[in-house]
Amino acid sequence: MITLAVESMGGDQGLAVTVPGATAFLQAHPDVRLIMTGDETQLRQALNAAGAPMERIDICHTTQVVGMDESPQSALKNKKYSSMRVAINQVKEGKAQAAVSAGNTGALMATARFVLKTIPGIERPAIAKFLPSDTDHVTLALDLGANVDCTPEQLAQFAVIGSELVHALHPQKGQPRVGLVNVGTEDIKGTDTVKQTYKLLQNSKLNFIGNIESNGILYGEADVVVADGFVGNVMLKTIEGAVKFMSGAIRREFQSNLFNKLAAVAALPALKGLKNKLDPRKFNGAILLGLRGIVIKSHGGTDKTGFRYALEEAYHEAKSAGLSKIEQGVAEQLAALEAAQNETAASL
């Protein structure tokens, strides 16, 4: 039985999204229990209204909620009994294999880092997410917004933890291909930080394939793509916006006249397949990667379907035990990276 901790009060709509999302998830997974943190009276009322299987739900009453615009410092100092903090505590105490929250990203990252700590050798956790491609291939992208200003060493650390996670989840595919997001593929391009990161990765034991432009990510050119949080977040939001724009443009075009409406009927199976593949809700659920525990961040503005998929991501990570397998690999890769760095410095 897998146990997940669910922060029920977080997100733009709170219980209106988390409870129906959790209910649908539980109905699809009889091997899961949930620890739902939040106001017990409100939670119990919402769960009963949703027809949730109460025999597989434990309610952990909390008295505080972290606001969506609350500072990380305030959340850490003043919200020790919040639904967010208590959910993460369940992972720390071994009562749950993973925690899921749609709450304030900065507060969640700060709280998770404070409670769970980072994997030895990793300075900062990163927000990582699996993105679709034009095939069945998926690509892990990080950092998607946690660290807007990074050193070359931190970017190299992101590459290490990303590579180790993908390898742990898909060992049959061999060493993951790691790409560094840049404005061109040539090693002379980019900022000084990116150029220095390129050299670090080039001398590492990772399967580094060089720079990758963002327009190649959805074509599966790499298994892991690395960027600082500023570039990564802009990249992610651009992809999400482009998908939304394209979906709307196709819909409007098919509704523009009678002929196109008739053509839409014939194309309906293909359109449904395309919509299903590009539905951003299916890829909701980002991993706070680099922590000594599994924490999944859902979009704050998601709906019940999107929140269910965030729970699916937590379930997948917990069941595969991928994060628990990577610490040794991370230590070995970081040691090799440091040795290569020292050799490079000595040769200068």
Curated annotation (Swiss-Prot):
A Gene Ontology cellular-component term: cytoplasm
One of the record's GO molecular function terms: phosphate:acyl-[acyl carrier protein] acyltransferase activity
Keyword vocabulary terms for this entry: Cytoplasm, Lipid biosynthesis, Lipid metabolism, Phospholipid biosynthesis, Phospholipid metabolism, Transferase
Catalytic activities: a fatty acyl-[ACP] + phosphate = an acyl phosphate + holo-[ACP]
Pathway: Lipid metabolism; phospholipid metabolism
GO biological process, one term: fatty acid biosynthetic process
Broadest EC class assigned to this enzyme: transferase
Subcellular location: Cytoplasm
EC number, as in UniProt: 2.3.1.274
Lyase as UniProt keyword: no
Function: Catalyzes the reversible formation of acyl-phosphate (acyl-PO(4)) from acyl-[acyl-carrier-protein] (acyl-ACP). This enzyme utilizes acyl-ACP as fatty acyl donor, but not acyl-CoA.
Record family assignment: Belongs to the PlsX family.
Subunit structure: Homodimer. Probably interacts with PlsY.
NCBIfam families: plsX
Protein name: Phosphate acyltransferase
Species of provenance: Neisseria gonorrhoeae (strain ATCC 700825 / FA 1090)
Designated gene of the protein: plsX
